[in-house]
Design a protein with these regions (language model features):
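Acidic-and-aromatic substrate-binding clefts and catalytic sites of carbohydrate-active enzymes
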Residues: 154-165, 185-205, 229-232, 236-239
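Short amphipathic alpha-helical segments and helix-helix/interface helices
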Residues: 135, 168-169, 207-211, 245
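Active-site clefts of carbohydrate-active enzymes
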Residues: 99-118, 206-243
Length: 245
């Protein structure tokens, strides 16, 4: 929440500064909201956030969904869990990315899996809420004159909702968001590391439900993040990660 408050303040300051500067503002038609594409940085490689801050935020989310301990206990099939002590599940299936188990545990069902469903939904709700908040700030500060788009909705390649990308309906109904963006699909693009045997050209597919996005009156912005002929490394873009701090 502190990060969200600070980023909101800084975004408002940036938009106000640009809007008040005639030389700058005449070149700006909109804002592309981006925060590591809105999923936790390296969440697949390093796993989810089990910090006290995230545990507390998850507990507050649970209290909205489940008014009483009894409601939570019934949903989770656990007579001992309480709203005051519930935490992020420490045995989240698929928490650490493993390509050999890519299609395992995509769907959850039953009371024993409800705690996982809830955490996945929490992450998606939190991500969508952050984007929605920043979009509102841009629209308010520009009096609805600026276009607002955001990276989001990578359902076709980020299969796990731990990415936070599986709440597109929320943002499709948000009047402050004009569109979404995403890179060309990584799994079938000119021999990427995910699909090294794919032919030159390949499909270059969309990562999201582009037709649904457009039917809801939103823009889809297709990003090409492929290496150009200027590249002098032997590593494809998707293998070139920054070292985590």
């Amino acid at each position: 929440d502190l990060f969200n408050e600070e980023s909101s303040r800084r975004l408002a300051h940036l938009v106000d500064y640009i809007s008040s500067n005639g030389e700058l503002s005449k070149h700006i038609i909109g804002y592309h909201l981006e925060n590591n594409e809105w999923f936790q940085y390296l969440y697949r490689e390093n796993g989810q956030d089990f910090s006290n801050a995230n545990n507390e935020k998850f507990a507050r989310w649970l209290k909205v969904k489940y008014p009483t301990d009894r409601d939570l206990q019934k949903a989770w099939g656990n007579p001992f869990v309480k709203l005051s002590t519930a935490t992020v599940p420490n045995n989240l299936p698929g928490n650490i990315y493993d390509n050999s188990k890519l299609y395992k545990d995509i769907l959850f069902y039953g009371t024993k899996a409800q705690k996982y469903v809830d955490y996945h939904q929490y992450i998606c709700d939190l991500t969508a809420a952050r984007i929605s908040n920043l979009a509102r700030i841009v629209k308010e500060r520009t009096e609805n004159r600026a276009i607002v788009i955001s990276f989001y909705g990578y359902q076709f390649e980020l299969y796990s909702s731990l990415s936070g990308h599986h709440n597109l309906n929320w943002l499709l109904s948000d009047k402050n968001i004009d569109g979404f963006a995403g890179p060309i699909g990584y799994r079938d693009r000119n021999g990427s590391s995910y699909a090294p045997n794919s032919p030159v050209g390949a499909t270059g597919a969309y990562m999201s439900t582009v037709d649904s996005i457009q039917r809801n009156g939103k823009i889809w912005f297709q990003e090409s993040d492929e290496r150009t002929f200027i590249n002098h490394t032997d590593e494809p873009y998707e293998d070139t990660f920054l070292t985590p701090i």
